[in-house]
Amino acid sequence: MCIRDRYYAETVIKKSLDKLYNLAQGGTAVGSGVNSPRGFDKKFIQHLKKISKLPFKTASNKYEALASHDVFIEVMSGIEILTSSLFKMANDIRVLASGPRSGIAELILPANEPGSSIMPGKINPTQCEALSMVCAHVIGLKNSITFACTQGHFQLNVYNPLIIHNTLDSINLISDALISFDKNCLKGIRANKAKIKELLNNSLMLVTPLTKVIGYDLASKVALNAYNKDISLKQSCMELTNLSEADFEKYTNPKNMV
């Protein structure tokens, strides 16, 4: 469920952090440093590093640091990758937990609330829905940051408050949502082993590895025959091919496909 996307997002975010530490203090109005005491920028950075314990540094080009805040687009792009991955994960879990009898129902979600106000006993995927809404909101915040970063007219971009506010808001929202999702959903999820086994054994797609044994055309006939007659893939294979039961079990064993 997009685990590698999560690590990719983490890589993008970490790489962009180094650029965030470049500060324009000492550049005064447009980056020239006019009227700034000599050495102010370095002393400011030293003091900030001391109280924050973070590796801040003075920007090598203060003109660029004041006029452009593109680094925030880079940071938010990493966060947007994370939100996209989380949105997919939440949606996958929600669909896999659909049911309990008319859906996929491979997952059993923890009951965080009494249930539906309309349908008694119905367990709503509220944590999945909450996380997906947070992701949608953060993607919107990222778009507003992108627009704000276009407003660097000549030597100065005065949209800093919007950029900083939405960046921090995005980080806080995603952090809180992840903590809640982990606590109230992930840690309580259970696999519905009986349902998983039922769906796995009834899956017509297990015919796929048989193509290298009986050929694509015959494998297609086996799958369609099983579907049209509402019989198992194994029964259909026994009807239409010379494959033994042992060989069928051997080639269609899901463990060999993991």
Give the predicted meaning of each segment:
Residues 30-116:
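Acidic, glycine-rich loop-and-beta core segments that form the ion-binding/anion-interacting portion
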Residues 9, 16, 82-85, 96, ...:
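Heptad-repeat coiled-coil/leucine-zipper interface motif in alpha-helices
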Residues 15, 19-22, 95, 102, ...:
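Heptad-repeat coiled-coil alpha-helices
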